[in-house]
């Protein structure tokens, strides 16, 4: 990384941290009095869009989106490739309102955790995989019924560029049981915002939104088949926009990161 890009990256982190502090402080006082959708727009959507703008202007990371016509009118379960922090910012600012799966322990962090709780996340206990799946099913279904998108990273963690992690069935199970489709999303954000290290590299991220996929039937077999279709689409699309994919050999993730 060049000296200029290193300076731009440091500046990006400084501005992002400062904006998070200011926005977080304002949100702590304003968010509790707002209804959920207005709260989401103020606390999450606006700041995440600012973060993406900052990424473009300061770090030189742009993006292009294909497949906008595939987004269904009714919120459903989003199954996204996970390579970096960028897609969390982008998807949170793009889909509204959106509920994410997170570790339950984060809700106990003073101020930060309390603010998260106001955004109605899906809090799970990752130390107990079976319980986590039940929590995802229950809380996720409640979010969908209230008209919120549910974002799941089925690989369970950020996967290095050029690799694919095995998809957990938690997201497809949630969709099938709710009678809704899954919306697969592929992107190559990790090429410019790597999982490891602090460096950011200028370039254009390709985001591809796939066709909404419905299950054929019900039950475990339908869940597994839908999961395979979603995983295959993401893998094939990643091969088009990113280096050749290589399967990551690790146990199937319990739910998500």
Curated annotation (Swiss-Prot):
Membrane topology: Multi-pass membrane protein
Record's keyword annotation contains Transmembrane: yes
Coiled-coil intervals: none
Keyword check for Transmembrane helix: yes
Catalysis performed (reactions): a 1-acyl-sn-glycero-3-phosphate + an acyl-CoA = a 1,2-diacyl-sn-glycero-3-phosphate + CoA
GO CC annotation terms, alphabetical: plasma membrane
Keyword set, alphabetical order: Acyltransferase, Cell inner membrane, Cell membrane, Lipid biosynthesis, Lipid metabolism, Membrane, Phospholipid biosynthesis, Phospholipid metabolism, Transferase, Transmembrane, Transmembrane helix
Motif (HXXXXD motif): 82-87
Origin: domain of life: Bacteria
GO BP terms in the entry: CDP-diacylglycerol biosynthetic process; phosphatidic acid biosynthetic process; phospholipid biosynthetic process
Gene Ontology molecular function terms on file: 1-acylglycerol-3-phosphate O-acyltransferase activity; lysophosphatidic acid acyltransferase activity
UniProt pathway annotation: Phospholipid metabolism; CDP-diacylglycerol biosynthesis; CDP-diacylglycerol from sn-glycerol 3-phosphate: step 2/3
EC assignment: 2.3.1.51
InterPro entries linked to this entry: Plipid/glycerol_acylTrfase (IPR002123)
Places the protein is found: Cell inner membrane
Deleted gene: phenotype: Inactivation of the gene alters the fatty acid profile of the membrane phospholipids by increasing the proportion of longer-chain (C18) fatty acids. It leads to structural changes in the bacterial membrane and alters the membrane properties, resulting in decreased membrane fluidity.
TM region positions: 10-30, 105-125
Subcellular location, principal: membrane
Known function: Converts lysophosphatidic acid (LPA) into phosphatidic acid by incorporating acyl moiety at the 2 position.
Family: Belongs to the 1-acyl-sn-glycerol-3-phosphate acyltransferase family.
Note: Can complement the E.coli plsC mutant.
Domain notes: The HXXXXD motif is essential for acyltransferase activity and may constitute the binding site for the phosphate moiety of the glycerol-3-phosphate.
UniProt-recorded name of the protein: 1-acyl-sn-glycerol-3-phosphate acyltransferase
The species this protein was found in: Pseudomonas aeruginosa (strain ATCC 15692 / DSM 22644 / CIP 104116 / JCM 14847 / LMG 12228 / 1C / PRS 101 / PAO1)
This protein's encoding gene: lptA
